[in-house]
Amino acid sequence: MLAATCNKIGSPSPSPSSLSDTSGSFGKGFHPWKRSSSTSSSCTLASGSLSGFSVGGSSRSANGSSSSSAAAAAAAAAAAAAAAALVSDSFSCGGSPGSSAFSLTSGGSGGSGGGGSSGSMSAASPFANEYSVFPVSGGSQEAAAAAAAAAAAAAAAASHHQPVFLSKVHASVDGLQSIYPRVGMAHPYESWFKPSHPGEVSAAAAGGASSWWEVGAGWIDVQSPGAGAALHPGALQGSLHSPLGGYGTDYSAAGLGHFSTGGGGGVGSGGGAAGTGSGGGGGGSHLLSPGGQHLMDGFKPVIGPGSYPDPSSSPLSAGSMLAPTGPLGGSPRSSARRYSGRATCDCPNCQEAERLGPAGASLRRKGLHSCHIPGCGKVYGKTSHLKAHLRWHTGERPFVCNWLFCGKRFTRSDELQRHLRTHTGEKRFACPVCNKRFMRSDHLSKHVKTHSVGGGSTGSTGPGSGSKKGSDTDSEHSPSTSPTCHSPDLLHPPDRNGLE
């Protein structure tokens, strides 16, 4: 009966008839590789003719005689005491001392003829090379002796196979490595853009089924060395022609020929086959160089007079993203002048001096800035004055009065300051002769002229000078009680001459 039961170890569901006599006597142990507790008890049973492991437990005896098995167990107990202690200490988990998660324990029920007897059955499981189940003590002294003998056999067999837990863990790790070959990599795409040998990428792309995390050929068409075109020329033409068509000549020389699009080979309409570095139907350059060059190493910009492609080769090159070479090197004079450390000026005199170079040093020493508007011809000694003058031509008025409900705009800052004095009533310009004060400097200059004119006509200084004074000064801003200003020299010249 036991032999028939052990022959059905591999079966997932043993028949109830074979386990009816043994299922009640054997306890339930913890077996991580089995799901059902009823089927786990049959994994370590074997016939008496096999050798390797022994399972301690109480079996039903037909006649109740167990003296021979007890004597054999007592003889082997002395030799295997140390091994049994080692096994019980190493594989014990909770419960009673010496109990193991990898063992089957007996219940201790007696048979029909006699109770408390146990049979020492040596067994070699079909899983001897994979699983190591260590039996421990049951419910009687005979079971403990049988467990010691089984531990000795297990210690001898432990040198050429692994325990259950270690073997299952190693098997699980190996299975993970076979299922997920890229688990141990530092970068998820390391093997894609940095292969150990040049043919790895092409082999992975040309190989049958690819994993979901691998970059397919739809993103960048990978080509193997010696091929005339890419793997999917249609996808390359549709996805890479428009955005990268203008960079074909530059990156073909850099070793990334798969980005170039062209006509040779029946792929495009430009010059050079798609995927080839030199045009025609020759061998295309690989995605990576044999020296382990990174993918991004080829994306170095190439700046030069011929780096910009023909506008007809790509619709993107004629747009705003790729400007022609003219604006880049168009005005070196303005760029040099901008960082020369002096104020910039675009007047005709300054441009002529810069065009002449060293010969225009005389023009630069003069510092004359002329207006470039035809018909104007005004010349200023400062660039700020010229810029203020140009605002008169353009109509720009950047200076705004912030007084309440005013908001007037002016072309020059001094005009704004003069306007603000009308709000505040400040008169900052005083006459040096009569100490009369004015708001504007031009009004003061006109007033000073009245003193010089009055000196020429000594007799006519009354009403004539008063009318002229009123015309020179702004009556609304001048004080009403201000006396008529006359110079002392003009008032009393005869008396002074008589005193002398």
From Swiss-Prot:
- One Pfam family recorded for the sequence: zf-C2H2
Gene3D superfamilies attached to this UniProt entry: Classic Zinc Finger
Spell out the Low complexity composition-biased ranges: 10-25, 36-46, 305-317, 478-488
Keyword Membrane in the entry? The reply is: no
Compartments it resides in:
Nucleus
Q: What's the chief localization of this chain?
A: nucleus
Q: Which UniProt keywords apply?
A: DNA-binding, Metal-binding, Nucleus, Repeat, Transcription, Transcription regulation, Zinc, Zinc-finger
Zinc fingers, C2H2-type class: 369-393, 399-423, 429-451
Q: Which terms does the record give in the GO molecular function aspect?
A: DNA-binding transcription factor activity, RNA polymerase II-specific; RNA polymerase II cis-regulatory region sequence-specific DNA binding; zinc ion binding
Q: Which GO terms describe its biological process?
A: regulation of transcription by RNA polymerase II
Instruction: Write out the GO cellular component annotations.
Output: nucleus
* Domain of life, source organism: Eukaryota
**Where is the region Disordered?**
1-46, 304-337, 445-500
Give residue numbers for sequence motif 9aaTAD: 210-218
Compositional bias of kind Gly residues: 453-467
According to its UniProt record, which protein family does this protein belong to?
Answer: Belongs to the Sp1 C2H2-type zinc-finger protein family.
Q: What does this protein do?
A: Transcription factor which plays a key role in limb development. Positively regulates FGF8 expression in the apical ectodermal ridge (AER) and contributes to limb outgrowth in embryos.
Q: What is known of its domains?
A: The 9aaTAD motif is a transactivation domain present in a large number of yeast and animal transcription factors.
This protein is called: Transcription factor Sp8
The record's gene field reads: sp8
